[in-house]
Amino acid sequence: MEVTDVRLRRVNTDGRMRAIASITLDHEFVVHDIRVIDGNNGLFVAMPSKRTPDGEFRDIAHPINSSTRGKIQDAVLNEYHRLGEEEETIEYEEAGAS
């Protein structure tokens, strides 16, 4: 299984969520609402979940082994960092243009 596409939208909130992503697996299956969270030990990827009536969060979809989780996390965080570098370049270009 390979992550063949990552679509990511950065969010600017007061909380710890930094972005929301959708991934495509093997050009055949899409998973939406994956979140990039700024945790105590750095960024991590949280799979889509819903709140149960008793207040617990349950994953809607999630990898069943650490290798697959690693592939998903690497793909999403690489895209997150790539977009951050693009934004920095745009900000520097705009600052230099005036």
Curated annotation (Swiss-Prot):
Keyword Cell cycle: yes
Domain of life of the organism encoding this protein: Bacteria
Entries under Gene3D superfamilies matching the protein: Stage V sporulation protein G (3.30.1120.40)
Pfam families: SpoVG
One GO BP annotation of this record: division septum assembly
This protein's UniProt keywords: Cell cycle, Cell division, Septation, Sporulation
Family: Belongs to the SpoVG family.
NCBIfam families for the chain: PRK13259.1
Physiological role: Essential for sporulation. Interferes with or is a negative regulator of the pathway leading to asymmetric septation.
Name of the protein this chain belongs to: Putative septation protein SpoVG
Native source organism of the sequence: Bacillus pumilus (strain SAFR-032)
Biological classification of the source: Bacteria, Bacillati, Bacillota, Bacilli, Bacillales
Gene transcribed to yield this protein: spoVG
